Amino acid sequence: MSKFLNKIVNGNALEILKTIPSKTFNLVLANLLTISQIGKKLKRPDNSNVNGVNDKWDQFKSFKDYDIFCKEWLNECKRVLKDNGSIWVIGTYHNIFRIGYHIQNVGYWMLNDVIWRKNNPMPNFKGTRFTNAHETLIWASKSKKSKYTFNYQSLKCLNDDLQMRSDWTFPICNGKERLKKNGKKVHSTQKPEALLHRIILSTTNKDDVILDPFLGTGTTAVVAKKLGRKYFGIEKDKKYFKAADERINKTKAIEESYLDTLENNKSKPRVPFGSLVELGIIKPGTNIFDQKKKINAKIMVDGSIKHKESAGSIHKVAAKIMGTESYNGWTYWYCNVGNSIVPIDKLRQKFLSKNI
Protein backbone atom coordinates (compact mmCIF):
# COMPACT_ATOMS: atom_id res chain seq x y z
CA MET A 1 0.00 0.00 0.00
CA SER A 2 2.84 2.43 0.81
CA LYS A 3 3.81 2.19 -2.85
CA PHE A 4 0.73 4.29 -3.65
CA LEU A 5 0.88 6.85 -0.82
CA ASN A 6 2.07 10.41 -1.39
CA LYS A 7 3.69 9.57 -4.70
CA ILE A 8 3.29 10.54 -8.33
CA VAL A 9 4.40 8.53 -11.36
CA ASN A 10 5.12 9.39 -14.98
CA GLY A 11 3.33 6.95 -17.26
CA ASN A 12 0.18 5.72 -18.97
CA ALA A 13 -2.85 5.94 -16.67
CA LEU A 14 -4.53 2.74 -17.87
CA GLU A 15 -1.36 0.69 -17.61
CA ILE A 16 -0.56 1.94 -14.11
CA LEU A 17 -4.13 1.65 -12.85
CA LYS A 18 -4.07 -2.07 -13.69
CA THR A 19 -1.14 -2.59 -11.29
CA ILE A 20 -2.95 -1.07 -8.30
CA PRO A 21 -4.69 -3.39 -5.79
CA SER A 22 -8.48 -3.23 -5.61
CA LYS A 23 -10.13 -1.00 -2.99
CA THR A 24 -7.08 1.22 -2.40
CA PHE A 25 -8.48 4.77 -2.60
CA ASN A 26 -11.16 6.77 -0.78
CA LEU A 27 -11.62 9.27 -3.61
CA VAL A 28 -10.87 9.57 -7.32
CA LEU A 29 -10.58 13.07 -8.74
CA ALA A 30 -10.21 13.42 -12.50
CA ASN A 31 -9.91 16.53 -14.64
CA LEU A 32 -11.10 15.06 -17.91
CA LEU A 33 -9.20 14.69 -21.13
CA THR A 34 -11.34 16.16 -23.90
CA ILE A 35 -11.92 16.20 -27.60
CA SER A 36 -10.97 19.71 -28.65
CA GLN A 37 -13.35 21.43 -31.06
CA ILE A 38 -11.40 24.63 -31.66
CA GLY A 39 -9.88 23.29 -34.86
CA LYS A 40 -8.16 26.49 -35.93
CA LYS A 41 -6.52 29.50 -34.36
CA LEU A 42 -8.74 32.12 -32.79
CA LYS A 43 -7.82 35.80 -32.63
CA ARG A 44 -8.46 38.39 -29.93
CA PRO A 45 -9.60 41.87 -30.96
CA ASP A 46 -5.96 43.00 -30.81
CA ASN A 47 -5.09 40.22 -33.31
CA SER A 48 -3.15 38.13 -30.75
CA ASN A 49 -3.72 34.37 -30.69
CA VAL A 50 -6.09 32.72 -28.21
CA ASN A 51 -4.42 29.79 -26.48
CA GLY A 52 -7.14 27.19 -26.70
CA VAL A 53 -6.80 23.62 -25.51
CA ASN A 54 -4.61 22.18 -28.24
CA ASP A 55 -2.25 20.09 -26.11
CA LYS A 56 -1.31 16.64 -27.40
CA TRP A 57 -3.12 15.00 -24.48
CA ASP A 58 -6.28 16.72 -25.64
CA GLN A 59 -6.57 15.00 -29.01
CA PHE A 60 -8.57 11.87 -29.88
CA LYS A 61 -9.20 10.66 -33.41
CA SER A 62 -12.91 10.06 -32.90
CA PHE A 63 -15.70 9.96 -30.36
CA LYS A 64 -15.53 6.16 -30.56
CA ASP A 65 -11.88 6.16 -29.45
CA TYR A 66 -12.70 8.59 -26.66
CA ASP A 67 -15.63 6.48 -25.46
CA ILE A 68 -13.51 3.32 -25.34
CA PHE A 69 -10.82 5.13 -23.37
CA CYS A 70 -13.32 6.60 -20.88
CA LYS A 71 -15.00 3.26 -20.20
CA GLU A 72 -11.63 1.64 -19.55
CA TRP A 73 -10.34 4.18 -17.05
CA LEU A 74 -13.71 4.53 -15.31
CA ASN A 75 -13.87 0.75 -14.81
CA GLU A 76 -10.33 0.67 -13.43
CA CYS A 77 -11.01 3.60 -11.10
CA LYS A 78 -14.14 1.86 -9.83
CA ARG A 79 -12.10 -1.24 -9.09
CA VAL A 80 -9.45 0.63 -7.07
CA LEU A 81 -12.05 2.66 -5.13
CA LYS A 82 -13.00 1.47 -1.67
CA ASP A 83 -16.63 0.38 -1.32
CA ASN A 84 -17.58 3.64 0.40
CA GLY A 85 -15.50 5.78 -1.94
CA SER A 86 -16.61 8.33 -4.50
CA ILE A 87 -15.42 9.96 -7.71
CA TRP A 88 -15.36 13.52 -9.03
CA VAL A 89 -14.90 14.35 -12.70
CA ILE A 90 -14.49 17.86 -14.07
CA GLY A 91 -15.38 18.62 -17.67
CA THR A 92 -16.78 21.05 -20.21
CA TYR A 93 -19.51 20.90 -22.83
CA HIS A 94 -17.02 19.05 -25.06
CA ASN A 95 -17.12 15.92 -22.92
CA ILE A 96 -19.14 16.04 -19.71
CA PHE A 97 -22.34 14.65 -21.23
CA ARG A 98 -20.53 11.67 -22.73
CA ILE A 99 -18.69 10.98 -19.49
CA GLY A 100 -21.90 11.19 -17.44
CA TYR A 101 -23.41 8.51 -19.67
CA HIS A 102 -20.42 6.23 -19.10
CA ILE A 103 -20.33 6.87 -15.34
CA GLN A 104 -23.87 5.54 -15.03
CA ASN A 105 -23.30 2.60 -17.38
CA VAL A 106 -20.19 1.50 -15.49
CA GLY A 107 -22.26 1.30 -12.29
CA TYR A 108 -21.43 4.39 -10.26
CA TRP A 109 -24.29 6.08 -8.39
CA MET A 110 -24.87 9.74 -9.28
CA LEU A 111 -24.94 12.09 -6.28
CA ASN A 112 -24.68 15.62 -7.71
CA ASP A 113 -23.70 17.67 -10.66
CA VAL A 114 -22.03 20.92 -9.66
CA ILE A 115 -21.57 24.03 -11.75
CA TRP A 116 -18.26 25.85 -11.40
CA ARG A 117 -19.07 29.37 -12.53
CA LYS A 118 -15.94 31.31 -13.48
CA ASN A 119 -16.04 34.97 -12.53
CA ASN A 120 -13.25 35.72 -15.01
CA PRO A 121 -13.85 33.45 -18.04
CA MET A 122 -12.16 33.79 -21.41
CA PRO A 123 -14.43 35.87 -23.70
CA ASN A 124 -15.93 34.56 -26.92
CA PHE A 125 -13.86 36.75 -29.22
CA LYS A 126 -15.67 35.90 -32.46
CA GLY A 127 -19.05 36.80 -31.00
CA THR A 128 -20.68 33.68 -32.43
CA ARG A 129 -21.63 31.95 -29.17
CA PHE A 130 -22.38 32.67 -25.53
CA THR A 131 -19.28 33.21 -23.41
CA ASN A 132 -18.44 29.81 -21.99
CA ALA A 133 -18.33 30.80 -18.32
CA HIS A 134 -18.64 27.49 -16.49
CA GLU A 135 -17.49 23.91 -16.17
CA THR A 136 -19.54 20.98 -14.89
CA LEU A 137 -18.47 18.62 -12.13
CA ILE A 138 -20.04 15.20 -11.57
CA TRP A 139 -19.89 13.57 -8.15
CA ALA A 140 -20.80 9.89 -7.87
CA SER A 141 -20.35 7.13 -5.29
CA LYS A 142 -18.94 3.72 -6.16
CA SER A 143 -22.40 2.16 -5.83
CA LYS A 144 -25.90 2.89 -4.61
CA LYS A 145 -25.04 1.18 -1.30
CA SER A 146 -21.87 3.20 -0.64
CA LYS A 147 -21.73 5.10 2.66
CA TYR A 148 -19.77 7.91 1.08
CA THR A 149 -18.18 10.81 2.96
CA PHE A 150 -19.97 14.15 2.86
CA ASN A 151 -18.86 16.74 5.40
CA TYR A 152 -22.12 18.65 5.50
CA GLN A 153 -21.39 20.72 8.60
CA SER A 154 -17.98 21.85 7.34
CA LEU A 155 -19.50 22.99 4.05
CA LYS A 156 -22.27 24.81 5.88
CA CYS A 157 -19.64 26.59 7.98
CA LEU A 158 -17.73 27.54 4.82
CA ASN A 159 -20.93 29.11 3.53
CA ASP A 160 -21.82 31.29 6.56
CA ASP A 161 -24.09 28.64 8.11
CA LEU A 162 -26.14 28.18 4.94
CA GLN A 163 -26.41 24.88 3.08
CA MET A 164 -23.77 24.67 0.36
CA ARG A 165 -25.40 24.89 -3.05
CA SER A 166 -24.39 23.09 -6.22
CA ASP A 167 -23.34 26.27 -8.04
CA TRP A 168 -19.87 27.44 -7.05
CA THR A 169 -18.10 30.63 -8.09
CA PHE A 170 -14.32 30.64 -8.35
CA PRO A 171 -11.93 32.51 -10.65
CA ILE A 172 -9.90 30.53 -13.15
CA CYS A 173 -6.33 29.83 -12.12
CA ASN A 174 -4.20 32.96 -12.41
CA GLY A 175 -1.62 35.10 -10.63
CA LYS A 176 1.19 33.45 -8.66
CA GLU A 177 -0.70 30.16 -8.58
CA ARG A 178 -0.59 29.80 -12.38
CA LEU A 179 2.52 27.88 -13.45
CA LYS A 180 4.44 29.57 -16.24
CA LYS A 181 7.70 28.98 -18.05
CA ASN A 182 9.27 31.72 -20.15
CA GLY A 183 6.07 33.72 -19.72
CA LYS A 184 3.84 30.96 -21.13
CA LYS A 185 1.35 28.76 -19.28
CA VAL A 186 2.78 25.36 -18.44
CA HIS A 187 -0.69 23.75 -18.67
CA SER A 188 -3.68 25.17 -20.52
CA THR A 189 -6.35 23.97 -18.07
CA GLN A 190 -4.65 24.22 -14.66
CA LYS A 191 -7.43 24.22 -12.05
CA PRO A 192 -7.56 26.74 -9.17
CA GLU A 193 -6.59 25.33 -5.78
CA ALA A 194 -9.73 26.83 -4.24
CA LEU A 195 -11.93 24.54 -6.35
CA LEU A 196 -10.00 21.43 -5.31
CA HIS A 197 -9.96 22.59 -1.69
CA ARG A 198 -13.76 22.53 -1.59
CA ILE A 199 -14.00 19.14 -3.30
CA ILE A 200 -11.43 17.46 -1.06
CA LEU A 201 -12.67 19.07 2.16
CA SER A 202 -16.27 18.10 1.42
CA THR A 203 -15.82 14.44 0.45
CA THR A 204 -12.75 13.12 2.30
CA ASN A 205 -11.40 12.98 5.82
CA LYS A 206 -7.91 13.48 7.19
CA ASP A 207 -5.53 10.67 6.08
CA ASP A 208 -7.86 9.49 3.30
CA VAL A 209 -6.11 8.51 0.07
CA ILE A 210 -6.94 10.36 -3.16
CA LEU A 211 -6.19 9.18 -6.70
CA ASP A 212 -5.78 11.56 -9.64
CA PRO A 213 -5.24 9.49 -12.81
CA PHE A 214 -4.62 12.58 -14.97
CA LEU A 215 -2.55 14.69 -12.59
CA GLY A 216 -1.49 17.49 -14.93
CA THR A 217 0.61 19.96 -12.97
CA GLY A 218 -0.38 18.47 -9.63
CA THR A 219 -3.16 20.62 -8.18
CA THR A 220 -4.96 17.62 -6.64
CA ALA A 221 -1.80 16.40 -4.91
CA VAL A 222 -0.87 19.91 -3.73
CA VAL A 223 -4.24 20.52 -2.08
CA ALA A 224 -4.35 16.98 -0.66
CA LYS A 225 -0.94 17.52 0.94
CA LYS A 226 -2.02 20.84 2.44
CA LEU A 227 -5.19 19.31 3.91
CA GLY A 228 -3.54 16.27 5.49
CA ARG A 229 -4.79 13.77 2.91
CA LYS A 230 -2.63 11.22 1.12
CA TYR A 231 -2.41 11.19 -2.67
CA PHE A 232 -1.31 9.16 -5.67
CA GLY A 233 -1.07 10.79 -9.08
CA ILE A 234 -0.42 9.58 -12.61
CA GLU A 235 0.75 11.88 -15.41
CA LYS A 236 1.77 10.81 -18.90
CA ASP A 237 3.32 14.09 -20.09
CA LYS A 238 6.93 14.46 -18.89
CA LYS A 239 6.76 18.26 -18.86
CA TYR A 240 3.64 18.30 -16.68
CA PHE A 241 5.03 15.56 -14.45
CA LYS A 242 8.21 17.51 -13.79
CA ALA A 243 6.24 20.68 -13.03
CA ALA A 244 3.94 18.75 -10.67
CA ASP A 245 6.85 17.11 -8.87
CA GLU A 246 8.58 20.44 -8.26
CA ARG A 247 5.33 22.06 -7.15
CA ILE A 248 4.43 19.29 -4.70
CA ASN A 249 7.90 19.32 -3.15
CA LYS A 250 7.58 23.05 -2.49
CA THR A 251 4.16 22.67 -0.89
CA LYS A 252 3.91 22.80 2.90
CA ALA A 253 1.19 20.94 4.75
CA ILE A 254 -1.11 22.88 7.04
CA GLU A 255 -0.25 22.26 10.71
CA GLU A 256 -2.12 19.17 11.88
CA SER A 257 -3.77 20.95 14.81
CA TYR A 258 -5.62 23.16 12.29
CA LEU A 259 -7.02 20.28 10.23
CA ASP A 260 -9.96 19.51 12.53
CA THR A 261 -13.36 19.91 10.90
CA LEU A 262 -16.93 19.97 12.19
CA GLU A 263 -18.60 16.61 12.66
CA ASN A 264 -21.96 15.90 11.08
CA ASN A 265 -24.71 15.86 13.70
CA LYS A 266 -26.35 12.88 12.03
CA SER A 267 -23.18 10.84 12.53
CA LYS A 268 -23.87 10.64 16.29
CA PRO A 269 -26.61 8.11 17.12
CA ARG A 270 -28.55 8.87 20.30
CA VAL A 271 -27.23 7.02 23.36
CA PRO A 272 -29.14 7.62 26.62
CA PHE A 273 -26.95 8.05 29.70
CA GLY A 274 -28.98 5.30 31.36
CA SER A 275 -27.73 2.82 28.75
CA LEU A 276 -24.16 3.38 29.93
CA VAL A 277 -25.31 2.59 33.48
CA GLU A 278 -27.19 -0.54 32.36
CA LEU A 279 -24.15 -1.78 30.44
CA GLY A 280 -21.82 -1.21 33.37
CA ILE A 281 -19.74 1.38 31.53
CA ILE A 282 -20.35 3.76 34.42
CA LYS A 283 -21.56 2.33 37.73
CA PRO A 284 -24.22 3.48 40.22
CA GLY A 285 -22.59 5.42 43.04
CA THR A 286 -19.92 6.92 40.77
CA ASN A 287 -19.07 10.51 41.64
CA ILE A 288 -19.31 12.99 38.75
CA PHE A 289 -18.41 16.67 38.90
CA ASP A 290 -18.12 19.90 36.91
CA GLN A 291 -14.87 20.88 35.16
CA LYS A 292 -13.60 22.82 38.19
CA LYS A 293 -14.54 19.96 40.57
CA LYS A 294 -16.59 22.36 42.71
CA ILE A 295 -19.97 20.68 42.12
CA ASN A 296 -20.52 16.96 42.69
CA ALA A 297 -23.30 14.51 41.96
CA LYS A 298 -23.86 10.78 42.42
CA ILE A 299 -25.18 8.38 39.79
CA MET A 300 -28.29 6.35 40.68
CA VAL A 301 -29.20 2.88 39.47
CA ASP A 302 -31.76 4.23 36.96
CA GLY A 303 -29.30 6.63 35.31
CA SER A 304 -30.54 9.68 37.20
CA ILE A 305 -28.13 11.76 39.29
CA LYS A 306 -28.43 13.51 42.66
CA HIS A 307 -26.83 16.80 43.62
CA LYS A 308 -27.85 18.01 47.11
CA GLU A 309 -31.65 18.24 46.92
CA SER A 310 -31.80 18.09 43.13
CA ALA A 311 -32.41 14.85 41.26
CA GLY A 312 -33.01 14.10 37.59
CA SER A 313 -31.23 13.46 34.33
CA ILE A 314 -27.66 14.65 33.71
CA HIS A 315 -29.16 17.43 31.58
CA LYS A 316 -31.89 18.63 33.98
CA VAL A 317 -29.59 18.78 37.00
CA ALA A 318 -26.91 20.62 35.01
CA ALA A 319 -29.53 23.10 33.75
CA LYS A 320 -30.77 23.77 37.31
CA ILE A 321 -27.21 24.40 38.50
CA MET A 322 -26.55 26.76 35.57
CA GLY A 323 -29.91 28.52 35.96
CA THR A 324 -31.04 27.76 32.42
CA GLU A 325 -33.98 25.90 30.89
CA SER A 326 -31.72 23.33 29.28
CA TYR A 327 -28.06 22.31 29.30
CA ASN A 328 -25.92 19.59 27.73
CA GLY A 329 -25.05 17.25 30.58
CA TRP A 330 -22.66 15.24 28.41
CA THR A 331 -20.22 18.15 28.32
CA TYR A 332 -20.99 19.59 31.80
CA TRP A 333 -20.21 16.49 33.87
CA TYR A 334 -16.79 14.90 34.28
CA CYS A 335 -15.53 11.71 35.93
CA ASN A 336 -12.29 9.96 36.80
CA VAL A 337 -10.99 7.38 34.34
CA GLY A 338 -7.76 5.94 35.64
CA ASN A 339 -5.51 8.88 36.40
CA SER A 340 -7.37 11.20 34.02
CA ILE A 341 -10.38 13.47 34.34
CA VAL A 342 -12.63 13.26 31.26
CA PRO A 343 -16.09 14.52 30.29
CA ILE A 344 -18.66 11.74 30.50
CA ASP A 345 -19.19 12.25 26.76
CA LYS A 346 -15.89 10.39 26.28
CA LEU A 347 -17.55 7.28 27.71
CA ARG A 348 -20.35 7.64 25.18
CA GLN A 349 -17.87 8.03 22.31
CA LYS A 350 -15.98 4.95 23.48
CA PHE A 351 -19.22 2.98 23.46
CA LEU A 352 -20.13 4.24 19.98
CA SER A 353 -16.72 3.37 18.54
CA LYS A 354 -17.14 -0.24 19.65
CA ASN A 355 -20.80 -0.77 18.84
CA ILE A 356 -21.75 1.37 15.82
Spell out what each predicted region is.
Residues 1-232:
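Core catalytic lobe of class I
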Residues 2-17, 246-271:
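S-adenosyl-L-methionine
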Residues 100, 104, 242-245, 249-252:
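Class I S-adenosyl-L-methionine
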Residues 105, 131, 227, 251-253, ...:
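Short alpha-helix boundary/capping motifs
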Residues 148-151, 256, 328:
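Acidic/polar loop patches that form or flank catalytic/metal-binding clefts of enzymes
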Residues 226, 230, 238, 243-246, ...:
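Intrinsically disordered, charged low-complexity linkers and terminal tails
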Residues 235:
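Conserved acidic E/D residue at the C-terminus of a beta-strand in Rossmann-like folds
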